UniProtKB/Swiss-Prot annotation:
Class in the EC hierarchy, top level: oxidoreductase
Protein name as catalogued: L-xylulose reductase
Function: L-xylulose reductase involved in the catabolism of L-arabinose through an oxidoreductive pathway. Catalyzes the NADPH-dependent reduction of L-xylulose.
Pfam family, one: adh_short
Length: 298
């Protein structure tokens, strides 16, 4: 793969697993050095191992930084401080943050007056909005002064949104609202930061992972109509990615319980993000780029 991001530096929140981990692999393969943010002690070993692998494989610098974005102000300070410590140029004594990926997020469905979880309350609302909206806002604001000044608009900010921002899934009054807010901020930042960066969002749909396969048949049934209408979701036996990334049990569940329609692989989402981070994405800003196999068209 072309090292089109050689010498660049990116911050990825929620970079230890899932889509964030896949983005880390993609950017590292392009020569980009990384700061991977993670939240809990349970992710420390995993993130350190990931950084070691990426550093060795791709000859880049990758550091793990623990910071809990549910308390965003000190978390942002921790991330920026670590970036200054490890990525300040020894020749110019300045820090340049070329790429920011606002990927970290939380989601827990709850219906209005939910019979099992109780009504939506301020604590539930604030938990979602603090991590999914306030944290990326504060981190983007903090990174703004370190975005590259030359060439013009050469910085990249990518916000990881969701199809939930606009499709009205039941139980997602709050989560869907946070992703709609993130997309609104994307458009605002595209104008405010136009001189130094492009700003876009990417909106995945269902993604392969342990959590998706654990959601169960009720959720899969809710998604079936959407998946049936997703042009790229048909499970194709023998396809390289299918054979590499899905277990036989997962393939069985897709055939028998999901109508033969698979979720995305995380690296498919990461590929779209990676493109937006390169020079090939230079004329795209303020957009919500669909990375969901056609589940939702722009």
């Amino acid at each position: 793969m072309s090292r089109s991001l050689e010498g660049k530096f990116a911050i990825i929140t929620g970079g230890s697993r899932g889509i964030g981990e896949a983005i880390a692999h993609n950017l590292a393969s392009k020569g980009c050095s990384l700061l991977l943010n993670y939240t809990s002690d349970s992710s420390r070993t995993r993130t350190e191992s990931l950084c070691n692998t990426l550093s060795t494989t791709h000859k880049i610098t990758c550091i793990p930084v623990q910071a809990d974005l549910s308390d965003p102000a000190p978390a942002v300070n921790t991330i920026i401080s670590a970036a200054k410590t490890h990525f300040t140029s020894p020749t110019t004594n300045t820090l340049t943050i070329d790429i920011l990926i606002n990927n970290a997020g939380v989601s827990k469905d709850r219906f209005l007056n939910d019979p099992s979880s109780g009504p939506i309350d301020p604590a539930y609302f604030n938990w979602h909005y603090t991590i999914n909206v306030l944290a990326p806002l504060l981190l983007t604001q903090a990174c703004a002064e370190y975005l590259p000044r030359k060439p013009a608009h050469s910085g990249r900010i990518i916000n990881i949104s969701s199809i939930s921002s606009s499709l009205g899934f039941t139980g997602q009054s709050v989560y869907g609202g946070t992703k709609a807010a993130l997309e609104a901020m994307t458009r605002t930042w595209a104008r405010e930061l136009a001189d130094v960066a492009t700003v876009n969002a990417v909106n995945p749909g269902p993604v392969v992972g342990d959590m998706y396969f654990a959601t169960g048949e009720e959720f899969w049934k809710q998604m079936q109509g959407f998946q049936d209408n997703t042009p790229l979701s048909k499970l194709v036996d023998g396809e390289e990615a299918v054979e590499e990334l899905l277990s036989e049990e997962q393939k069985r569940l897709i055939r028998e319980k999901m109508g033969g329609r698979r979720p995305a692989f995380t690296r498919e989402i990461a590929g779209v993000v990676g493109m937006l981070c390169t020079e090939d994405g230079a004329w795209c800003t303020g957009s919500v780029v669909c990375a969901n196999g056609g589940l939702k068209f722009t």
